[in-house]
Amino acid sequence: MIGRLRGILAYKQPPWLVIDVGGVGYELEAPMSTFYDLPDVGRDVILFTHYAQKEDSVSLYGFLREGERRLFRDVQKVTGIGAKIALAVLSGVTVDEFARLITSGDITALTRIPGIGKKTAERMVVELRDRAADFSSGAPITGQLGPDAISEATVALQQLGYKPAEAARMARDAGAEGGEVATVIRKALQAALR
């Protein structure tokens, strides 16, 4: 299948991006952890990918770091968890933070990630605890400048499963000091986990 793509970033709007590889545009869904570090549109990018085929759809997911792709795949092995929740995990916490939450059994923090309830968090801890030490992240998080960071962050938070009013409040609170889109989103998600 498709394991990696190298091309020009043609489009990015969370959670979607398009990479032009030899004139073919590959549409991928990606977690916010990937969006934080993406280059500007028109620049070269290399993404690790996960190809998923269901009865009625085909999906391609993109990750800047191999550790994120590995975590995405491992989280989906937990009973009752699919791609949407796996993306929410990677959008809500770093790979290292997730490993710490699993190792320590922090159910409360896990339930703050959209789509994860108490029972799902407990299942995750039980089923992933042995593999948590193998999770590895990569480079530090950086962002992209945007003309309206709060507006873009609100849209991104809605795509992650937050209700419109809640997403707007989170983005407003996190963006009070201004800053890049990725910074506003990261601050909002970190505040939600507290």
UniProtKB/Swiss-Prot annotation:
Subcellular location(s) of the protein: Cytoplasm
Region (Domain II): 65-140
Keyword terms, alphabetized: Cytoplasm, DNA damage, DNA recombination, DNA repair, DNA-binding
Pfam families, A to Z: HHH_5, RuvA_C, RuvA_N
Highest taxon above the source species: Bacteria
Region (Domain I): 1-64
Region described as Flexible linker: spans on this chain: 140-144
Gene Ontology CC, one term: Holliday junction resolvase complex
Chain spans, region Domain III: 145-194
Primary location recorded for the protein, binned into one broad class: cytoplasm
One BP term from GO: DNA recombination
InterPro entries for the chain: DNA_helicase_Holl-junc_RuvA_I, Hlx-hairpin-Hlx_DNA-bd_motif, NA-bd_OB-fold, RuvA, RuvA_2-like, RuvA_C, RuvA_C_sf
One example GO MF annotation: ATP binding
Domain characteristics, as noted in the entry: Has three domains with a flexible linker between the domains II and III and assumes an 'L' shape. Domain III is highly mobile and contacts RuvB.
Function: The RuvA-RuvB-RuvC complex processes Holliday junction (HJ) DNA during genetic recombination and DNA repair, while the RuvA-RuvB complex plays an important role in the rescue of blocked DNA replication forks via replication fork reversal (RFR). RuvA specifically binds to HJ cruciform DNA, conferring on it an open structure. The RuvB hexamer acts as an ATP-dependent pump, pulling dsDNA into and through the RuvAB complex. HJ branch migration allows RuvC to scan DNA until it finds its consensus sequence, where it cleaves and resolves the cruciform DNA.
Similarity annotation: Belongs to the RuvA family.
Subunit and interaction comment: Homotetramer. Forms an RuvA(8)-RuvB(12)-Holliday junction (HJ) complex. HJ DNA is sandwiched between 2 RuvA tetramers; dsDNA enters through RuvA and exits via RuvB. An RuvB hexamer assembles on each DNA strand where it exits the tetramer. Each RuvB hexamer is contacted by two RuvA subunits (via domain III) on 2 adjacent RuvB subunits; this complex drives branch migration. In the full resolvosome a probable DNA-RuvA(4)-RuvB(12)-RuvC(2) complex forms which resolves the HJ.
Protein name, per record: Holliday junction branch migration complex subunit RuvA
Species whose genome carries this gene: Xanthomonas oryzae pv. oryzae (strain KACC10331 / KXO85)
Taxonomy of the source species: Bacteria, Pseudomonadati, Pseudomonadota, Gammaproteobacteria, Lysobacterales
Gene from which the chain derives: ruvA
